Amino acid sequence: MIGRARPLMFLGTGSDVGKSVLAAAFCRILKQDGYSVAPFKAQNMALNSYITPEGGEMGRAQVVQAEAAGIEPHVDMNPVLLKPTSQMGSQVIVRGRAIGNYSAQEYYEYKKNLVEVVRESYERLAARYDVVVLEGAGSAVELNLKEHDLVNLAMAKMADAPCILVGDIDRGGIFAALLGSTMLMTPDERDRTIGFIVNKLRGDPRLFASGVDILESRSGLPVFGVVPHFDHIALPEEDSVALGRRARRVETRGSEDALMVGVVRLPYVSNYTDFDCLEHEPDVELLYFDRPEQVFGFDAVILPGSKNTIEDLAFLRKNGMAEAVVAFYKSGGTVVGLCGGYQMMGLRVSDPHGVESSIREIAGLGLLDMETEMFQDKVTSQVTALNIGGSGLEVSEDDALRGYEIHMGRSASMGGARPLFRIVSRDGLPVQVEDGLIQPGGRAWGTYIHGIFDNDGLRKAFLAGLKSRSGKTRVALSAGFSYQDWKNEQYDRLADHIRQHVDVKRIRRIIGLW
């Protein structure tokens, strides 16, 4: 074993089976039991990312797990992050810093250079914590990818980690998935696998008792638990599968008792975790949509972050969404842009160096009087900012707003709209930098700061403005909702749910935690 930590790894029979959630649950459970715990995923591919206090970029799943463990996120918890920029390529981020855009073939050729990077990151965590909870990616036994494996059984061997194989019974084929996965393992890999968790059962777990017997008798491995599907716990999700689920909810809109907020679903959307806090506000219905005719009827439309602003803007123009959003604003609606969405709201976006696209220049929506140019260097910083924009977002100028920047472009105001925020610190260092723009009246504004809605005061001010403009007198805006308190409640609920349905004590004994 590397370092002093006891490792425990969750492997999956496929994507979206619940590895990330179970890893977060065990981070919380072991924290509650008095252990210092850190999450770890060697390589993550994600639409959403986060900036650490040191200015490093990492995947949001490990941020959630770190929060559940009660510790500050660090890039060692996710040393390699892949952010898709096209159908065939990704931006590769190593130890929190972007090293370039790679095609799949180029990345496979480069991957061997990352083994020691991953090992060193894991060793640092293992030396600092009692337990490291590791997470694999996708299926643990993709045989055609095994030669280049960095995140699944190769990582388990590197960390000498006992592994729990997780299967999703809701999608069907649980026996083939779990038993078939173990059959494809080498003898050493099977020896490292300590048991199964059957996840996402709809109904009474007791009705699967015969299934547990079949799995245990055919594999010789224990089933540590059968976890029911839950709806009473809400956790941030980071992959495109989750976004698809959210987009299908658009047909539920129409309530006069809630503020209706629509997020445009972009082909290269990123950091849609920016809207989790709004999604769980008691008086808000937040929905994702991608058809122009859906825009009217919302109280506000948000253009989210993008991994390819120019291509996404071209998409909006092609399918008519750009015209619809402008018409929505002209009819009295509120439009907000975050990061790439903020860039789209300007007069034009140019990319003379081909950073994102072969398109060198494209017209923006013209809702904010600014222009954006893409540059090779990437801004990644945690920031503290003050509101200076006034009208429409009445937050005290003394209220410190916290968030983070992740962007390749630089935007310059052409006059007209007012600066929205003044950034007063980046990665803990004092600065004086204006950010964002807001039109008089507050119906059009944008910012580069991700996580801006996580600030309770600003979010409440934004919603109060929407209520006033919408005339929805029945909306009662809950004053007591704290997003941070709400998240901690979800982590505790998750821990309770897993303790109820998984033999946590048995797992603890196996990994040496008595």
Curated annotation (Swiss-Prot):
Pathway: Cofactor biosynthesis; adenosylcobalamin biosynthesis. The active site is at residues 339, 450. One of its GO terms (biological process) is cobalamin biosynthetic process. InterPro entries: Class_I_gatase-like, CobQ/CobB/MinD/ParA_Nub-bd_dom, CobQ_GATase1, CobQ_N, CobQ_synth, GATase_3, P-loop_NTPase. Signal peptide: none annotated. Residues 258-458 form the GATase cobBQ-type domain. GO terms for molecular function: ABC-type vitamin B12 transporter activity; catalytic activity. Keywords: Cobalamin biosynthesis, Glutamine amidotransferase. Gene3D superfamilies: 3.40.50.880, P-loop containing nucleotide triphosphate hydrolases. Pfam families: CbiA, GATase_3. It comes from the Bacteria. PANTHER family: COBYRIC ACID SYNTHASE, DETHIOBIOTIN SYNTHETASE. Belongs to the CobB/CobQ family. CobQ subfamily. Catalyzes amidations at positions B, D, E, and G on adenosylcobyrinic A,C-diamide. NH(2) groups are provided by glutamine, and one molecule of ATP is hydrogenolyzed for each amidation. NCBIfam families: cobQ, PRK00784.1. This is Cobyric acid synthase. The lineage of its organism: Bacteria, Pseudomonadati, Thermodesulfobacteriota, Syntrophobacteria, Syntrophobacterales. The gene is cobQ.
